[in-house]
């Protein structure tokens, strides 16, 4: 029987580059505006990409005297499309985020002194959380101040599972109750502009408690030879101690009633020891009937011999002469 899943590969998100650059429209010349850069990630869950508008991001900002402390609030966890106006000669700094395109997150705070955003007690769903902190905007000239540049980073990782089978399509092989257990599903995360540092702190769920759940696969043996579950957005964390559980069930010709087995597999750490923000990971395994029950024996074939070709001789052909 299969004892472990095998990590096939990692798709790396291009966090230091972007494919889209959109300048947010500003209603008036002196209004504070933003331009956004969002790093790429491979398609899977509902992702936030570079095609953004100011109505998609939320902003927290502070300003103060030139060279002094930035302690006066502006943009109090409000949409980037909200209109505020530059104060002549002041310094500004902004923190921004987007929880996918799913709206405001109330548990966010921004430390202007350390250029750090904090997301308290955050639980991923299907939304791609991205965060950014601007450079300090110093000694503003209100009439000519340009848009504030924001380069967003992905705060979460993505993890998916691929199930394969060699079972014939006369059978129904269902995979259900796919879930990650003993992983962190609720945590406090920080993004610090210096070094683009992302950190998360939280406690793992217990044995038998779902940290992240995946969609059931109705029939793996449907003639396509494999079926992929969707990816989930997940808190970045160490992989050690985390496991995946699922229920495999097979029915069909000669199998009455259906055979079912709940399978638990610790995630290997040989190739990947932690899930990093902005990266996508895939685990794959093969499930056949013998992994579900030992009551079934597959039909197998032994090729005893394929005979060699015998020589039948070589015969010359005479070409007829040309007739006059």
Label every PLM stretch briefly.
Residues 2-324:
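Sec-type signal peptide cleavage vicinity
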